[in-house]
């Protein structure tokens, strides 16, 4: 009777944790499931993988197996182990084999391993305006139910009313404890994680806690200064444009950015000079007067003389 190398069958290492082994089992169970696999030895491999999982998934059985494996080359072990030659060998025989070799003192009472359920992640889209205050959101998602082979047997629809706190940021994760998949053998449920996705805004760009908005100005507004209406997340405000403002200049509007527990960011209005349409004869004459008055001004001075 040969002691099978369950770790090799699962493609894992003896030092791997249960989560890693479970991932390997599910991958192999899907690969060799007789209903989906076209490989000639699929059924035999599937049974072998299921047998390995039944031992390695149970904390006590895995400890017993590790002890058996450690002594597999000892002459005394081999003599006693060979007494089981010809008997069917599977995971359910494990307790009897271990007890006959090491005696009852070498093991504890058998118990099934309690395993925590899986976490579930869903993406929740939030508008920028919604980040200013806490708000309620109804979310719907599906909780997968796994069969004994680690395959999804069905999905249970679920709906929750949740609170989205003020000041959430893009990529932030909100944990809802116990709302994931059910645990196994009395283990705790997994959690539901809401991953916040801030929806793109037609006006504002996000830079950490700050916001940026492009502020279009006519050439004379930039040159002479002006008071213009600027949008914020809550309302429009009147912003003073200093004379001689330049394209690309950033005007800070304090406290009009995104809020968080620590501080509130600022809004930056970035000036963009917008030229009027092609001038008519009268407007062209005015532009010419301006050009004559500013004849010494060279916007390309940094290039040097030709």
UniProtKB/Swiss-Prot annotation:
Residues 5-69 form the J domain. It comes from the Bacteria. SUPFAM superfamilies: Chaperone J-domain, HSP40/DnaJ peptide-binding domain. It is found in: Cytoplasm, Nucleoid. SMART domains: DnaJ. GO terms for biological process: chaperone cofactor-dependent protein refolding; protein refolding. Gene3D superfamilies: DnaJ domain, Single helix bin, Urease metallochaperone UreE, N-terminal domain. One of its GO terms (cellular component) is nucleoid. GO terms for molecular function: bent DNA binding; unfolded protein binding. CDD domains: DnaJ (cd06257), DnaJ_C (cd10747). Keywords: Chaperone, Cytoplasm, DNA-binding. It holds the Pfam family DnaJ_C. DNA-binding protein that preferentially recognizes a curved DNA sequence. It is probably a functional analog of DnaJ; displays overlapping activities with DnaJ, but functions under different conditions, probably acting as a molecular chaperone in an adaptive response to environmental stresses other than heat shock. Lacks autonomous chaperone activity; binds native substrates and targets them for recognition by DnaK. Its activity is inhibited by the binding of CbpM. HAMAP family: CbpA. This is Curved DNA-binding protein. The gene is cbpA.
């Amino acid at each position: 009777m040969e002691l099978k190398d369950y770790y090799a069958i699962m493609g894992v290492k003896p030092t791997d944790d249960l989560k890693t082994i479970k991932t390997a089992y599910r991958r192999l169970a899907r690969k060799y499931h007789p209903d989906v696999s076209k490989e000639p030895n699929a059924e035999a491999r599937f049974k072998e993988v299921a047998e390995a999982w039944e031992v390695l998934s149970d904390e006590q059985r895995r400890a017993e197996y590790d002890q058996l494996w450690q002594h597999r080359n000892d002459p005394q072990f081999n003599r006693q182990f060979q007494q089981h030659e010809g008997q069917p060998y599977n995971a359910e025989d494990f307790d009897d084999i271990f007890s006959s070799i090491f005696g009852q003192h070498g093991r504890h009472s058998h118990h099934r391993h309690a395993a925590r359920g899986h976490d579930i992640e869903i993406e929740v889209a939030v508008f920028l305006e919604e980040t200013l205050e806490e708000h309620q959101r109804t979310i719907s998602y599906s909780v997968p139910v796994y069969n004994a082979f680690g395959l999804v047997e069905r999905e249970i629809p679920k709906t929750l009313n949740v609170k989205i706190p003020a000041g959430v940021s893009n990529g932030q994760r909100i944990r809802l404890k116990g709302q994931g998949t059910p645990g196994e053998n009395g283990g705790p449920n997994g959690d539901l994680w809401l991953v916040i996705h801030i929806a793109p805004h037609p006006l504002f760009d996000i830079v950490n806690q700050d916001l940026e908005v492009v502020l279009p100005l006519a050439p004379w507004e930039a040159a002479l200064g002006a008071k213009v209406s600027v949008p914020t997340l809550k309302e429009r405000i009147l912003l003073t444009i200093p004379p001689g403002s330049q394209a690309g200049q950033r005007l800070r509007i304090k406290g009009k950015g995104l809020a968080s527990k620590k501080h509130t960011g600022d809004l930056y209005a970035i000036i963009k000079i917008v030229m009027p349409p092609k001038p008519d004869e009268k407007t062209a004459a005015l532009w010419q007067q301006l050009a004559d008055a500013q004849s010494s001004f060279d916007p390309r001075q940094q290039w040097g003389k030709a």
